[in-house]
């Protein structure tokens, strides 16, 4: 709900102001450590943490298998309906250590309309 989101934003803001979360320190942590730190905050889940790592910290090897847009673009790329986490992770293992970069290309394919015939955000 909107009220929950407001309380989460306030909580994150307080954590930053109280220096319980120092955003610049995340740069020095491993991906797993940064995700753990972010998800320790109420309202910050795995999806949000991974998006922060990919788009703010510019981490190169984060695979956003929880993201609907990524999965739809993955379906388009590989012409498959199998988007189970295990299947996606196995197929995308070859992208490492550049998984985030590959994911960004898939997001770009979506943004530019390349996937429009196959992309259905809500079926």
Residue ranges and their predicted role:
Residues 1-42, 94:
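Alpha-helical ds-nucleic-acid-binding substructure associated with the helix-hairpin-helix region
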Residues 31-33, 46-123:
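C-terminal accessory module of base-excision DNA glycosylases/AP lyases that mediates lesion recognition
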